[in-house]
């Protein structure tokens, strides 16, 4: 065991405690990464607030970058000293989804309580989201890391680990956006801005950003949005349709607010789909009219 510092959550809604924990050495296809930077995702905040429950104590953090400092005996293609991004996407490589080209939704469960970290007393400690990156080091599966050039700063690289791949992935993988289609992105935060970038890369015709902040809408245009709509109005979906000239082919909800999911189908055109990215609190629900969506072949799909 190696003793390291980590920010540990002992009680939901309370400040994290920086304290010593024990980290075991990597085994089999695992890699130890000494972290150079870790970003704070809203998911980390939601977990720490208790929005989704879970085991405590826990170490959160899942957007990280650093140097490989040790490897398990079955690791191939990575060496000590390599610079890597660490993600929460852990893939077994042999379940139905992994075999079918969707490793981001691997079906093999990961027991974070039985992971590589313990309290200094030897008690269970949750490695949240298979990362536990609010720490000096992590031990993760090789499938969770991607080698990066040494020229990329760790602080910048850490943002690739969730915000970028979540936003761009929602557009490219979940929506399968085609050139010339029109999209609405609700929420111009980190994930929303990357959904906007993804839509631009995919060749979208009109990209409408919707947010409560004028400042964020201006930033969204720098990232590729063609139009900005304030969500503070009574019917922002009408403003979005006016900007596009029709309903959207895809609406990306990047905020974890149930009321926004209630409104999302209103932005759609015929055959459009709502892509669900933002995650509300556990136990919350949303409502929509199935008859309206069925009549014009609309749909809803989740995106991790």
PLM feature spans:
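NAD(P)H dinucleotide-binding glycine-rich loop of Rossmann-like/cofactor-binding domains
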Residues: 23, 92-186
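Glycine-rich phosphate-binding loop and adjacent beta-alpha segment
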Residues: 204, 257-304
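Residues located in well-ordered beta-strands
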Residues: 5-7, 17, 22, 34, ...
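Glycine-rich beta-strand-centered segment in the early N-terminal region that forms part
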Residues: 24-38, 48-99, 104, 149-151
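Residues in the short beta-alpha loop(s) of Rossmann-like NAD(P)-binding domains
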Residues: 12, 213, 280
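A short acidic, Gly/Pro-enriched loop at the edge of an enzyme's catalytic core
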Residues: 239-249
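Mid-domain Rossmann-like dinucleotide-binding core that forms the NAD(H)/NADP(H) cofactor-binding site
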Residues: 84, 143-145, 149-234, 238-239, ...
């Amino acid at each position: 065991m190696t003793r390291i510092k980590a920010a540990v959550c002992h009680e939901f809604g309370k400040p994290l405690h920086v304290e010593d924990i024990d980290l075991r050495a990597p085994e089999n296809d695992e890699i130890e990464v000494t972290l150079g930077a870790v970003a704070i995702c809203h998911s980390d905040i939601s977990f720490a607030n208790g929005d989704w429950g879970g085991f405590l104590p826990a170490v959160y953090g899942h957007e990280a970058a650093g140097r490989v400092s040790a490897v398990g005996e079955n690791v191939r293609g990575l060496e000590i000293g390599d610079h890597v991004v660490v993600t929460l996407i852990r893939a077994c490589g042999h379940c139905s989804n992994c075999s079918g080209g969707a490793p981001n939704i691997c079906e093999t469960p990961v027991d974070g309580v039985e992971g590589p970290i313990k309290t200094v007393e030897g008690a269970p400690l949750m490695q949240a989201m298979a990362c536990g990156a609010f720490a000096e080091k992590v031990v993760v599966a090789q499938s969770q890391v991607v080698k990066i050039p040494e020229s990329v700063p760790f602080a910048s690289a850490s943002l690739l680990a969730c915000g970028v791949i979540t936003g761009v992935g929602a557009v490219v993988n979940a929506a399968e956006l085609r050139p010339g289609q029109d999209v609405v992105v609700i929420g111009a935060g980190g994930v929303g801005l990357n959904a906007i970038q993804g839509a631009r890369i995919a060749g979208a015709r009109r990209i409408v950003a919707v947010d409560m902040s004028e400042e964020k809408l201006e930033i969204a245009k720098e990232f590729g949005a063609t139009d900005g709509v304030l969500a503070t109005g009574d019917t922002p979906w009408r403003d979005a349709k006016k900007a596009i000239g029709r309903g959207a082919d895809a609406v990306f909800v990047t905020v974890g607010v149930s009321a926004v999911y209630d409104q999302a189908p209103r932005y759609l055109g015929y055959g459009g789909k709502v892509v669900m990215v933002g995650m509300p609190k556990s136990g919350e629900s949303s409502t929509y009219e199935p008859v309206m969506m069925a009549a014009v072949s609309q749909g809803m799909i989740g995106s991790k």
